[in-house]
Regions:
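Catalytic phosphate/metal-binding cores of nucleic-acid and nucleotide-processing enzymes, i.e., regions
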Residues: 1-102
């Protein structure tokens, strides 16, 4: 789990969600694979399901495009899921989060 993913997971747990890491590492290809090619974390709580893609703030637009092009994206929305981007950045020496809901 990357540092940014760990930050998002900790934040969601603090907000009262149950959170699962849904990306995995393929040791043969030495690459990470997201759920449906676009989701890093899946959270449930407060009567909702939230799919989260975690990145740095500078890559938000690329990740937004990646999610919107994913075959599973329309079905996530039809299923009532919230799909959210977490873009982390440092301000001074404190981490800040920019959250974008799709």
């Amino acid at each position: 789990m990357s540092n940014l993913t760990a930050r998002s997971k900790a934040l969601l747990i603090e907000l009262g969600y149950q959170v699962a890491l849904v990306e995995h590492y393929n040791s043969f290809t030495k690459r990470k694979h997201d759920l449906w090619g676009c989701i890093d974390l899946l959270a449930i709580g407060h009567g909702e399901t939230v799919a989260i893609q975690v990145t740095s703030k500078g890559h938000l637009s690329e990740r937004r495009h990646k999610i919107e092009e994913a075959e599973a994206y329309p079905e996530m929305l039809r299923s009532g899921w919230r799909v959210v981007l977490h873009g982390w950045f440092k301000e001074g020496n404190r981490w800040q989060l920019k959250e974008v809901e799709l």
